[in-house]
Amino acid sequence: MAGDHEDEFFDFNVSMVSDPLSTFYGRVDTDQMIEEGIHPGDIAVINKAEEPKHGDLIVTFVNNEFVIRFLDLSHLEDHYILLHPSNRRYSAIRINDIENFEVWGVVIWTIKKWR
């Protein structure tokens, strides 16, 4: 807790970001991930150099807007990708044009906004 170790200093960029040149921060502006505990106003720490894998939380650009979703690669043999929200009010986004689909970055941390 703050004040317990006054001589220690926590530097977020050193302690939690392994690749500062490829890391960006974005404010979440959607409720599509609330069941995962990610709410509007939270900050997503995004690494553009990470290779996206099945199940990763990613940021991508779909229908002229940035979206934050879970990447589902289990349908690659059927030539499509799904992007899953974490809010039952929203449906998965199906990506049929996988040749031109681009992940903007992989979310490696989120920072919670309390107020």
Predicted segments, located by residue:
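Short, positionally conserved secondary-structure boundary motifs
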Residues: M1-H39, E51-H54, E65-F66, H75-Y80, ...
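Hydrophobic beta-strand signal
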Residues: V45-I46, V59
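Fold-independent oxyanion-binding glycine-rich loops
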Residues: K48-A49, S86
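Well-ordered beta-strand positions in beta-sheet-rich domains
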Residues: I43, I68-F70, A92-R94
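Short beta-alpha junctions and helix-cap segments that line functional grooves
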Residues: G55-I58, R69
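Residue-level recognition of conserved beta-strand positions in structured domain cores
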Residues: F70-L71, P85
